[in-house]
């Protein structure tokens, strides 16, 4: 992967601006954590450059010194599986093989979906069950979470809607299987 100097400068400037905004808004207090496992309060995993991630929770916001894909992988492992195992499970259940939604934890239907290819540095992961609604605003998506938090995502409406529907399909299949078991 060839990364230009211009791109790296842009990432550094974005990081500085990001931290400045967070300090002004008083949501981010400057603490950077080394590890994080996705939990029932996690709303979104938002990368800030290559090895730094902003995690939005219902009541908190954390900076993690780890890329977003690593957080997803570690969270899958924390709940007893690997990312590749979860991805294969999604493919078997739904037939989806690219930009797959992932079941982080099955008993509580903790499902996350990527906004782009998970291999890309800028891939954001969103918790399906935390979304209240989403709409297009000036070519971007504004996601409203159930707890009234919101986030802008630089993605087309069609692409976001497709990812949301894929995750919903996975959730429906999981719920249907659980009903058959009972």
Model-predicted regions and their roles:
Residues 3-126, 132-182:
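Eukaryotic intrinsically disordered, low-complexity regulatory linkers and tails enriched in Ser/Thr/Pro
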